[in-house]
């Protein structure tokens, strides 16, 4: 498939332990294509030679081989949980707009980082330009500005933010018609402290 072709090319250029690609119709959520790496041959599903060298295979215990096979057979698109990363930003903005803690014309000065408790969360601009400077809400989304989103989340507060996560379906199964679907990882309020 086209997806698998590009996935193999990507992994040759930037080797990874696993890769998951899902192509969806953004209008209705229909899955148009899906691929997972590493791949295995359905005609020879126990062949690990495409993933491990002869030396690596020779040094593996039976348990290691079994675990390697399970990893090889895993559909990483549905059976693993991943942090949503910047795809979370539109949901943060939507919650902020709905609750009135941010408005379309609002600006925020990105200094390149924001502290959440003791942790410094950097903006991707931190290593290049240091910061985005003053941004509108639209520019914050366009530039994927982490500090602006943190500012919105702080204004929402942990309880409201967690309520919106639940309303948007984060942490829940999608109901895809494939076996082994994992749920997302969500922290309960007891594990989240106010900044």
Regions found by a protein language model. Name each.
Residues 1-19:
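Conserved, well-ordered alpha-helix/loop/beta-strand core segments that scaffold catalytic motifs
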Residues 4, 194-195:
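Surface-exposed, proline-anchored Ser/Thr-rich loop/turn motifs
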Residues 19-21, 26-87, 91-193:
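Beta-lactam-recognizing serine transpeptidase/beta-lactamase-like catalytic domain environment
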């Amino acid at each position: 498939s086209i997806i698998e072709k590009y996935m193999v090319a990507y992994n040759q250029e930037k080797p990874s332990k696993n890769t998951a690609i899902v192509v969806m119709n953004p209008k209705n959520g229909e899955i148009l294509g899906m691929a997972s790496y590493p791949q295995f041959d359905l005609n020879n599903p126990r062949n690990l030679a495409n993933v491990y060298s002869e030396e690596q295979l020779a040094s593996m215990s039976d348990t290691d081989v079994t675990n390697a096979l399970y990893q090889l057979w895993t559909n990483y698109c549905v059976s693993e949980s991943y942090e949503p990363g910047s795809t979370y930003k539109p949901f943060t903005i939507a919650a902020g707009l709905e609750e009135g803690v941010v408005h379309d014309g609002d600006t925020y000065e990105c200094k390149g980082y924001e502290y959440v408790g003791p942790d410094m969360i950097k903006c991707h601009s931190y290593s290049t330009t240091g910061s985005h400077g003053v941004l509108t809400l639209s520019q914050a989304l366009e530039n994927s500005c982490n500090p602006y989103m943190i500012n919105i989340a702080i204004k929402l507060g942990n309880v409201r933010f967690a309520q919106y996560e639940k309303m948007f379906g984060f942490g829940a199964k999608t109901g895809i018609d494939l076996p082994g679907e994992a749920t997302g990882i969500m922290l309960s309020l007891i594990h989240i402290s106010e900044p």
